[in-house]
Structure formats: C-alpha cells, structure tokens
Amino acid sequence: MLVILLGAPGAGKGTQAEYIADRYKLTHVSTGDILRASIKKGTELGKKAKEYLDRGDLVPDEVVVKIVEERLKEPDCQTGALLDGFPRTVEQADTLDQVLADMGSDVDAVLYIDVSEEELISRLTGRRICRDCGATYHLKFNPPQVRNVCDQCGGELYQREDDSMETVKQRIKVYREQTEPLIDKYRKKELLYPVDGDKEIEQVFKQIEEILDQKSPNSGG
C-alpha cells in the first residue's frame, strides 16, 4: 500500500505519519527528514536546499524527486510506504506517477490534513527547540517548566528561523499556491480523502483509521 500524506506546515503530518506507519506497517518516507539530514551534514544537496528553505520557499523538484525515487527503491519500501512531504506540486505528482508506473506500483490513497490558517500560525510560531539535545517544545501545547530552558538537558531553547511569524505566513502562502492544484488533481482521480486537522491528535488519527482500514490488509482488525 502506498499512501501520500498532504497538509500545510504545522498540520501535524509528522505525528500522524508515525501513527500510520506503525499501525499499517508502512515505511515512513519523510522528505523533510532527508533534507534536514543533508543540511546538517553540509552536503551539496543540503546547501542547495537550505538556501530555499531559509527564504520560506520550496526545494526544487529535481532535488526532491531524485531523493524520493531512490528511497522508494530501497527494500524496506517494497511492502508499503507512506510519503510525507512529497509530492507538493502537480509537476512532482506527475513525475511520481511515472516513477511508480516504472516500478509497477500506484498510489492507493491521498490523505489531506486540512487545518485553518489561524491554527497553523499558532502551532508554528509557538515551537521552540533545544540547541543542545534537539528536544521540541511548544509555548502553548507543551511548554518547558522554565521559560527558554530545556527540561531534559538544561540547554537553551530557540525559535527556528522558519518558525518566525513572517516566514510562517510566507510558508503557508507558498503551500497554498503550489499545493492546492495538487489537491484538485487527486480529488479528480478520486484518491483524495480530506481529514479535519483542527481536532485533537487522537481524533485526527481516528478519521485516518476509518479511511485506511478499508484499504489495508495490515490494519490489525
């Protein structure tokens, strides 16, 4: 089973992806994780990606597509995969269709976690990360015991540049402009399943279960 997970920055895709991968025995393929690892290592690909991300723009197709194609061909993806963060544009989706056709595969379902803009901004601008251990906090949902100090290691908490109000609004704008045509594409192909992402995490996953239980042999009953 191949599932695509769509949703704006801050929609909670990462959390839901973990639940989905565990429940349905799918390999979680996160382009965000792959890109962040490349940036941290300072690879050529990482440097290119960082330039775009720092501006609040999307990473170019040719960079992302190559990563995803290679990842999907690895052995752990042969029994099923969950694509998180890709495709983001109709062009990427068309390329993915070609890649999957060459592999004798196809998309089974596209989950779209729909969250209001107000909620997205609240979630993203409140995020804080520990400089030392990487632990993540949120000023509203998961605040540290002492302001700007990590509960786990005592390190300093900071706001990532791409979590600032200005960059967040730009990220959402870019997402809407580039990804909404993609949503229309999958709706027309009758592969799109909207999920109300404004709800609590457990309620969001319950909606997803109702969709995927009808499609997967690995739902666990």
Q: At which residue positions do the language-model features occur?
A:
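Glycine-rich phosphate-binding loop of ATP-dependent small-molecule kinases
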Residues: 1-221
